[in-house]
Each structure stands twice: as C-alpha cells, then as structure tokens.
Amino acid sequence: MAAYGRILKTVTEASDEILQIAYVRGLCIGTAAAIASAFDFVVAKADAPFYVTSAELGGHSAEAGAWCFKGDQDASLGYIRSLLDFIPDTTVDHETSDDLNRLLTELPLSADIRASLTAIVDDGALIEVYADYGTPIVTAFASVGGIKCGVVAGNYTEDHGRITRDAAYKTAEFLDICDSFGLPVVTLVNSDGLAADIPMDAVRSLFCLCTTRCPRRDRHSRSCHRCRLYITRFQEPR
C-alpha cells in the first residue's frame, strides 16, 4: 500500500507539469484504476476491464467518464498519437493552407455542432475527448490559424445543449488541462441553460471558466440562456 501511495503522489506532483496519458490494454481494477484515473487522459482498449469497484457495486467506469477514448488497439494507439499532436511541448504550431479570414458560407448550427467545428478549424481536423460523456457539450483539440487550441462547444442536438452534471464536470476537467498546458480556448455557446436536475456542485465546477488563465474567445453561435450567459461573460477582455 505504501508503494501505491508513492506512485499516486508522484503522478499528482507531475500533474500540470508533465503530460500523462494512461493506456489501459488489459485488466485494470482497484488501486491501479485509481492511479490511471489520476492521469491527464485515459485511453482504454475496448475489452479491457477498468474500474475501481465492480459494476455490481456501482463502480462501473462508463458512468464516471473515466476514459477519454475507448476502441480497439489500433484505434487507441492512433488516438494517443493524435493527442500528442495537439499538446504544447510535444508539438509546435504548424503552417496551414486554410486562410484564417476565409468566408464560411454556411454553418449548420441547428445540426450537430461537430459539423460547424469541422468547418471552422484548420483543415477540418480535430480530436474530440470524452465524446461519449456529457454529450450536451463537445470538447476537442484543434488548430485555428496554425495555433493549437482547445474547443468547448454546446451541442444543441443533445437536449438543446442544456448543461448536465456530466457535461459540467467534463467541461471543468477539459479547461483545467488547457489551462495547465497554456492552450487557448475557443468556446462556441449554443445552450438553453442548465438541466433542471443539475446539482449545485456541478454548477460550481463551471465557474472554472472564470478562473482560467489561458486566452479565451467566446462566440454565441445561437442560443445562450441564463447562467450560461453569465459564466461566459466572467472574463477579462483580451
């Protein structure tokens, strides 16, 4: 147990300083799963058991948003390589043939927001994290004008973009990672506010939007109601 404690302490101390990606390719349960969950990203092989406590006891990882991607071995390793392409200190900004000031003739804002994001970012390339968790919000890494950035977007096709508990925690976690590694964040707001059953601790987690130090740009793309409007306004002009 002391060794487990030392490992977890080392992982925690490295947080915000070193990019940490855990790849779960086999059985990972109990304390090992807890340590993996402390990494910045967890990528899991589709058939790999991954939980702190068993599903029968309510500890199934699918309910906790424990991984940012799950697929077969080739897809998982490809996803990890793509992540490394977007995190500073593991990559550099690159030249793009897409003009930053190009005219976007049509953005399908009423459709899945991913279509709009593909039109906005360089070369239509982005890598989504936690795609199956907190689905009213889309979080992804991309490049705009050759500059690597994080993207947070309301997905209006999922309950009119109303922010749920999972979506709030997902947003807070993603923004913390962007802030840690100095990635600017582009926010596309398209939300009818908060879900009726969202707990207060999840609402509080959203106020990380107010405390992030990384550059941010917010764009109200369609709908911006109530608390969501206030949160996006709590930032210093840049």
Where do the protein language model's features map onto the residues?
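Ligand-binding clefts of soluble mixed alpha/beta catalytic domains
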Residues: M1-R238
